[in-house]
Amino acid sequence: MSNGQVVAFEPVDEQPAAESGPIRIHLGANQHALPGYINVDIEPFAGIDVVADLEKPWPWPDNHADEIYTADLPEHLRGWYEVPDPDLLAAAKQTGDIRTLIEAIEKPKRTYGVIHFMNEAHRVLKPGGLLKARIPTTQSKAWAQDPTHVSFWNENTFLYFTHPGYRGIYPHLITAKFDVVKVDTIMPNQYGESWVKAILRKPLA
């Protein structure tokens, strides 16, 4: 966010240095940019390569990245939200039909934040690419103590993107399909805070 406005998908550097080797993306870098990564945040902090609103479509093509890393970001993305229907908006833009534009606004599309995050991560990763995430778990004080935490994550969340039975519950919503490398929960610290850590791999086929 810059001067009260969300700056979406605006590269700060045209060719981030991280793209010269394996493409590794660090989502929610904040003020902790990592060397060797394309550092991404909604704010243009020092060291940020791409400013992006991750509740919208992510600014990378399909099968693009070798690794996506995120720590203490996904819980800040809304659990669900509604946006004007993108297909109707595109049709209205192409035809100039005001009735189609009104329909797009009056019939918004509901997006579930957790599903959107996982679907986009899967889309952007290359086959065999890794998603590495550390997120405050709902099983601890770490999730509930922060007033900016607005979506729910724990070990079982990842079942919906890895286990055939759970993935099949919402086939019209979930496109992501991952293999589990490791999912576990970090034991609480002295403040009762704990995190779920997940390493997931996009299948080769």
Where are these regions (language model features)?
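Short, glycine-/aromatic-enriched active-site segment of Class I SAM-dependent methyltransferases
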Residues: 99-106, 136-150
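A short beta-strand submotif of the Rossmann-like class I SAM-dependent methyltransferase core
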Residues: 67-73, 117
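Core SAM-dependent methyltransferase catalytic element
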Residues: 182-205
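A short glycine-rich, Lys/Arg-flanked "PGG" loop and its adjoining helix->strand segment in the class I
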Residues: 87-100, 110-127
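Hydrophobic adenine-recognition pocket in adenosine-nucleotide-binding enzymes
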Residues: 41, 73, 121
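Conserved beta-strand signature within the Rossmann-like core of class I S-adenosyl-L-methionine
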Residues: 128-136
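Adenosine-cofactor binding site in Rossmann-like domains, unifying the SAM/SAH pocket
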Residues: 31-62
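Conserved Class I S-adenosyl-L-methionine
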Residues: 144-177
